[in-house]
Amino acid sequence: MAPSLPPELAALLAPFCVTHEGPGPNPFPAVSLEGVHALARRLEISPAKSMALCLEHDVWPLRFARNRGVFLAREQRRLLESRAAVIGCGGLGGHVVTLLARAGVGAFTLCDGDAFDESNLNRQILCREAVLGRNKALVARDELAAIAAHADVRVFPAAAGPGNLPEILHGASLVVDCLDSLAARRFVAAAADAAGIPFIHGAVAGDEGFAMLVRPGEKSLEALYPDRAPAFENTFDGGGAQLRAGVPTLTPAAIAVLQAGLALRVLTGKKTTGARLCHLDLAGPMLEVLAL
């Protein structure tokens, strides 16, 4: 047990702790979900705050133990205390939400006005036959409850637009763009810039896709999608490009991994480089990083 933990709390957690030999340089204590809940009840705090308190004393929740070595305890705690706004809960968004939840992000705002249909079954991880016809954001909320019951989740089962974006982005640490409309992306990017939070873009068509971090004040999205560009010729414009090239099973999953990776770097305070576009072509396969 971590020596800095108050004796009363150390005694409470002891029956629920195991010693892990790794990952990381030294053995460390890890506490089970049952222990997290016991501490939450004793202190009358939420399970998320219970896990954050454990991490403050370098006691790792067992559910995050394999993250150690990649994240420091303080970085894992930052994730628990962060809120990710995910706009679009389909092909990209379903993967992004589940990846961030498993990594440890503690709060989400989910926005999507669409319902699942049969054409989504080939690629959208949250789409199952049992949920056809249900709103995507509401299904994502239910999935989060099953993966990470401690997560605080706000849901907007409606399309994002200028009228509701300030409310959607309120309190968010960053926003992840999982949309398929260039016009909607521009609205969300402008709202993120106005709110002073990072915007993580993702787009897919065929075997190819983009992922990009846009920090407040940067104009990378405008550089990638200039107004003068023909909407259906040279850009990943969402609906147009997808109608031409299709959206197979693998591409959304791969681009969502890149988006989630960028989000985790931002949320944990790791060094990030803006004005860089990650272009993935699974037909190669090839990954290139381009300066904008």
Across the structure, where does each feature detected by a protein language model lie?
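Oxidoreductase and adenylate-handling cofactor-binding alpha/beta cores
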Residues: 256-271
